[in-house]
Design a protein with these regions (language model features):
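SF2 helicase motor core recognition
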Residues: 68-74, 121-124, 283-287, 309-313, ...
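Conserved Helicase C-terminal RecA-like lobe
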Residues: 1-18, 186-336, 401-409
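Conserved helicase motor
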Residues: 21, 41-50, 64-70, 92-96, ...
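Short basic/glycine-enriched coil/helix segment immediately N-terminal to the Walker B
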Residues: 54-58, 71-81, 105-107
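Conserved helix-turn-beta segment of the N-terminal RecA-like "Helicase ATP-binding" lobe
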Residues: 22-46, 136-137
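Conserved P-loop NTPase motor "coupling/switch" region that bridges the ATPase
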Residues: 11-13, 28, 37, 82, ...
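A conserved SF2-helicase RecA2
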Residues: 351-409
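Structural recognition of the conserved hydrophobic beta-strand(s) that form the central parallel beta-sheet
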Residues: 16, 62-63, 84, 111-117, ...
């Protein structure tokens, strides 16, 4: 569409803002495939280098969210008349510096396309920042007023969506075009399955000890969303194989039962496998075990540089090795195509419905030729409760205190 507008003389230059992890692997590669006659540059690195790239006058410049803040003045003067924001939910909060920086860059005659599959994944309030940027007249001046339009206050700490919240969100996000995956792609089916995992004796011991401690802490006290999230996170960490103690140390657990089930899933899979692991230390434990067993494995997490991620993704898609990617969900939940795999395993659940859905979509997208399976490893009641909410597409953050009480009962 952007290339068409260029051909029509309506657009001269395009700025693409996207996650760091997909600047090369998705955007540069896709532009090369679909618009090989256009010039493309990726603005990444030190500020001086980014500025130099922007000044080169290529047709497309691809930059990550934080990079926009670093070279905002250069972007203002860069002659961009179309701005494309991929995974636009990163701009849902109009109070952030990130949002304000981009808003200042946009001129009245700037084309703006904000792309997301989940415009209000966590709450109807998430739509406010997107709407205020695309069509400011569609929403009130203040976010609190919009929140009152779409949410009802139940307690000091709890808000729930109003019955007509979805209609309100749809209205304020116009103009918009929506395509479902089924409308765009003829994809093989996707199946969700649960695999029961027995906690080891050591895990059970510490899990029950922590539950008793948490029950004592909340007895007679009001449970807040903050302490509920902290407590639940500790229970999930124990279930996954490593828990961070109050003094910053890490306590590791035997993961033999969970690992055995994972190996069964890997052995059963006809293609490659993605394993999503929310906790960093558990990533290291699991990866060591897989490599020790001779399974070629690479890690994708926050500490892996953008060039290294691009190289790993390319190798995963095109070569026989690695067979398994162990991924911290937030590091590769958006934009990346990983269709060399047809099996997704959740070593432990995440609390974000958006991250969960987007991560699963890494395999179920254009180019997939095989039936896909999402496997949830469930060992503790905390994990089962979280997966239940994810399966029912319920925003966990709005239910965190209720969920916490259920787990402790």
């Amino acid at each position: 569409a952007s290339d068409f507008l260029m051909q029509q003389g309506k657009v001269n230059r395009v700025l693409v803002i996207c996650p760091l992890s997909i600047m090369d692997s998705a955007w540069r590669n896709d532009l090369f495939d679909f618009a090989p006659h256009r010039t493309v540059a990726v603005a990444h690195g030190e500020a001086k280098k980014r500025k130099s790239i922007i000044e080169q006058n290529t047709d497309y410049v691809v930059i990550n969210y934080d990079g926009v803040e670093i070279v905002s003045e250069s972007i203002k003067n860069g002659g961009f008349d179309l701005v494309i924001v991929d995974e636009a939910t990163h701009y849902k909060n109009a109070q952030t510096r990130r949002w304000k920086t981009l808003n200042k860059i946009l001129r009245d005659n700037t084309w703006l396309w904000m792309m997301t599959g989940t415009p209000a994944a966590q709450s109807p309030v998430d739509a406010y920042g997107l709407a205020k940027m695309v069509n400011p007249t569609a929403v009130p001046r203040f976010g609190g007023t919009f929140r009152d339009m779409v949410m009802t206050k139940i307690t000091n700490f709890k808000w729930i969506p109003k019955a007509d919240a979805t209609n309100t969100v749809h209205r304020v996000l116009q103009p918009a075009i929506r395509f479902t995956k089924d409308e765009c792609l003829d994809l093989p089916s996707m199946t969700y399955v649960k695999r029961a995992v027995e906690l080891t004796r050591q895990q059970k011991k510490y899990y029950e000890q922590l539950k008793r401690k948490l029950v004592l802490e909340v007895t007679g006290e009001q449970v807040t969303a903050v302490n509920a999230a902290v407590g639940m996170n500790k229970l999930l960490q124990i279930s996954s194989g490593a828990v961070y103690t109050d003094d910053g140390a890490t306590l590791e657990f035997d993961i033999k039962h969970r690992y055995k089930v994972l190996r069964e899933v890997i052995d059963e899979s006809s293609q490659k496998v993605l394993v999503f692991v929310p906790f960093k230390h558990a990533i290291n434990i699991l990866t060591d075990r897989l490599r020790k067993d001779g399974i070629s494995t690479e890690i994708i997490q926050g500490s892996v540089s953008a060039p290294a991620r691009t190289s790993i993704f390319k190798q995963f898609q095109e070569a026989t090795s690695p067979r398994v990617l162990v991924i911290q969900p937030a590091s590769a939940a958006h934009g990346v195509t990983l269709t060399a795999a047809n099996t997704v395993v959740w070593w432990s659940p995440v609390s974000s419905l958006e991250t969960y859905a987007q991560a699963n979509a890494r395999v179920h997208r254009s180019g997939q030729k095989h039936k896909c399976t999402v496997v949830q490893l469930q060992g503790s009641d905390a994990e089962k409760h979280v997966y239940r909410l994810l399966d029912n597409r319920i925003n966990i953050h709005t239910k965190i205190t209720d969920l916490y009480k259920e787990i402790l009962d």
